[in-house]
């Protein structure tokens, strides 16, 4: 044992520091500055600052004698044992079973048992201490220091085990992808069939709902509903609806309310698909508020209660719906020439679509044929003068299939058709200043300004 530890380089302080310094605090601090070549042999306990011996004269003999005294001390086997336990605690993997070195073999509890066994064995053979009290104090302090290191290493291992356990538990509870992998192990084929069937049924149901909504809107306003291009974009967009739902489900955090849902809703959420009832409710709200498809916070809360989803899921669904459903309808309307102005969130112009069951600005009801509608003095209605008798529009109306008048932007000052929309038929713009009737002046003074509000 002594030869083994003599060859190891784990004790640089023991080789470079005389043992007599551990009995006196002042002596210990003073001797820490001496190098290996200046070490003095082991001496008496009452000495002060030791005078180092000249190099090469008895230094090797003194070091060897000090090492022999340390290796021959009764407590040295216990010191070597706790040192090995500290090494095992830092270089070996942890295992609670203790089936290999590095498990509970290097724990502090096992070291307590080793101390008891060692003390029992040593007392029967020889005393625990030697005749040198300074060496005894050195051995006891070294064992205590290593004991403290072992306790701290055990605390670090406990913290690591606790963190790993909590991290794995958090991953299992927060990530639905783990649940999807578990489901695929047993029923991957059935899940794929259910997913395909739900996509097909959702697409068919959405198309039928759109047709019913189209017929209802046409009967109410006397105008056709969305064009075939809009329906094509609707049905073509249903295939991407499932991907949006999956993104929303993964992005939304799970809450404790999931425990109160039934098994079917849990299964649907595991696969990232919203229930059909929830999708239909949000889609119905979207088409009822096409003029302003931005639900307020209260409306989001109400929709979340009606659909059984979270507010974040409802919000994400409407973001995707505005991008994938509303925007293609607007683009199709602009391409086919049904709307004179691009879409704005306030619903200033949506082409030939009827929104919220009210007449659109561009649709002409029975009444004056030269103006875009029979506006009344409502708080949201803008003032407008009436043209003189015999006035006919200078721009021919649209085809009978569309049946809506020119855009309101034609009545704004600066528009290319502004002068022709104000002047009577057959008049030219250069007659505007020289030949104005009172009715023309009234009409010119009360042009519509939709940007005033």
From Swiss-Prot:
Q: Return the GO cellular component terms, semicolon-separated.
A: cytoplasm; nucleus
Q: Where is the MEIS N-terminal domain?
A: 102-185
What is known about the tissue distribution of this protein? In early-mid neurula stages, expressed in a single stripe in the neural plate. By neurula/early-tailbud stages, expression is localized to rhombomeres r2, r3 and r4 and the anterior spinal cord. Some ventral expression was also detected in posterior rhombomeres. Not expressed in rhombomere r1.
Spell out the SMART domains in the cross-references. HOX
- Tell me one GO molecular function of this protein: DNA binding
Keywords on record: Activator, Developmental protein, Differentiation, DNA-binding, Homeobox, Neurogenesis, Nucleus, Transcription, Transcription regulation
Instruction: Name a biological process GO annotation.
Output: positive regulation of cell population proliferation
Query: Which family is annotated?
Result: Belongs to the TALE/MEIS homeobox family.
> Has keyword Transcription regulation?
yes
Compartment(s) of residence: Nucleus
- Gene3D superfamilies under this entry? Homeodomain-like
Q: Where is the signal peptide?
A: none
What protein name is recorded for this chain?
Homeobox protein meis3-A
- Residues within the DNA-binding region(s): 267-329
Recorded hits in InterPro entries, A to Z, give: HD, Homeodomain-like_sf, KN_HD, PKNOX/Meis_N, TALE_homeobox
Biased segments, Polar residues type: 218-242
> For the region Disordered, what residue ranges are annotated?
37-60, 206-272
Q: What does this protein do?
A: Caudalizing protein which is required to pattern the anterior/posterior (A/P) axis during central nervous system (CNS) formation. Inhibits anterior neural expression and acts as a transcriptional activator to induce posterior neural gene expression. Maintains a proper A/P balance required for hindbrain formation by activating the FGF/MAPK pathway, which modulates the planar cell polarity (PCP) pathway. Interacts with retinoid signaling during hindbrain patterning.
Q: Which domain of life is it from?
A: Eukaryota
SUPFAM superfamilies recorded for this chain?
A: Homeodomain-like (SSF46689)
């Amino acid at each position: 044992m002594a030869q083994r530890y003599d060859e190891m380089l784990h004790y640089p302080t023991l080789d470079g520091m005389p043992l007599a310094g551990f009995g006196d605090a002042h002596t210990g601090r003073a001797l820490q500055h001496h190098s290996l070549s200046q070490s003095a042999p082991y001496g008496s306990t009452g000495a002060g600052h030791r005078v180092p011996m000249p190099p090469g004269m008895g230094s090797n003999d003194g070091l060897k004698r000090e090492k022999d005294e340390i290796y021959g001390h009764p407590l040295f086997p216990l010191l070597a044992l706790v040192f090995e336990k500290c090494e095992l605690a830092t270089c070996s993997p942890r295992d609670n079973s203790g089936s290999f070195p590095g498990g509970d073999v290097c724990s502090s509890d096992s070291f307590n048992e080793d101390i008891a066994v060692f003390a029992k064995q040593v007392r029967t053979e020889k005393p625990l201490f030697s005749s040198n009290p300074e060496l005894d104090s050195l051995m006891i302090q070294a064992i205590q220091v290593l004991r403290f290191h072992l306790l701290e290493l055990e605390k670090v291992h406990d913290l690591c085990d606790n963190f790993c356990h909590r991290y794995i538990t958090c991953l299992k509870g927060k990530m639905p992808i783990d649940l999807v992998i578990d489901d695929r192990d047993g029923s991957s084929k059935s899940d794929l069939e259910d997913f395909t069937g739900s996509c097909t049924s959702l697409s068919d149901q959405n198309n039928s709902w759109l047709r019913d909504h189209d017929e209802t809107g046409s009967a109410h306003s006397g105008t056709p509903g969305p064009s075939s291009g809009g329906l094509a974009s609707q049905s073509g967009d249903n295939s991407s609806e499932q991907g949006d739902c999956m993104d929303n489900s993964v992005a939304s955090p799970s809450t404790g309310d999931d425990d109160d849902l039934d098994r079917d809703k849990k299964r649907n959420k595991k696969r990232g698909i919203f229930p059909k009832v929830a999708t239909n409710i949000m889609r119905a709200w979207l088409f009822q508020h096409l003029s302003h498809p931005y639900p307020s916070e209260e409306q989001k809360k109400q929709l979340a209660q009606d659909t059984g989803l979270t507010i974040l899921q409802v919000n994400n669904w409407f973001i995707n719906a505005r991008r994938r459903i509303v925007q293609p309808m607007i683009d199709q309307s602009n391409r086919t020439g049904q709307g004179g102005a691009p879409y704005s969130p306030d619903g200033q112009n949506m082409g030939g679509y009827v929104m919220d069951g009210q007449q659109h600005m561009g649709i002409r009801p029975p009444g004056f044929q030269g103006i875009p509608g029979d506006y009344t003095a409502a708080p949201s209605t803008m003032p407008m003068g009436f043209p003189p008798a015999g006035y006919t529009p200078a721009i021919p109306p649209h085809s009978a299939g569309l049946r809506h008048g020119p855009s309101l932007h034609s009545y704004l000052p600066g528009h290319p058709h502004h002068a022709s929309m104000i002047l009577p038929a057959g008049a030219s713009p250069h007659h505007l200043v020289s030949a104005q009737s009172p009715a023309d002046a009234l009409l010119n003074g009360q042009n519509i300004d939709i940007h005033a509000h």
